[in-house]
Amino acid sequence: MKALGYWLMVVGSLRLASVWFGFFNIWALRLAVFSQTTMSEVHGRTFGVWTLLTCTLCFLCAFNLENKPLYLATFLSFIYALGHFLTEYLFYQTMTIANLSTVGFFAGTSIVWMLLEWNSLEQPHSKLS
């Protein structure tokens, strides 16, 4: 397995921990992510379901890095997550810069790494003699 695959499993595991907070410990989720606003339990469960989906993408992609559609969906999940959290910080002020920095580190690293690895997904073309 490539190093990117291991990285995606680490990120997927961290996302899985966030799923727990979304479903069962809304207080911890509020402190860890959305510290500038109130959250209801339905917000936590919605966050948990979204995060479970992105966690699943990370694990599937980690074991199938050569699958371009899956790779692209996983890559876009990082773009969407970073965009969402940037919006929460910049426009709605529901996050602190410290919380955004944590999300930004994992999403940003994943985005850059996946971009760098994108061209290595090309399958060599067989030569016709």
From Swiss-Prot:
It is found in: Endoplasmic reticulum membrane. One of its GO terms (molecular function) is protein-macromolecule adaptor activity. One of its GO terms (biological process) is regulation of auxin polar transport. InterPro entries: Erg28. One of its GO terms (cellular component) is endoplasmic reticulum. The chain crosses the membrane at residues 4-24, 46-66, 71-91, 96-116. Keywords: Endoplasmic reticulum, Lipid biosynthesis, Lipid metabolism, Membrane, Steroid biosynthesis, Steroid metabolism, Sterol biosynthesis, Sterol metabolism, Transmembrane, Transmembrane helix. Belongs to the ERG28 family. This is Ergosterol biosynthetic protein 28. It comes from Arabidopsis thaliana.
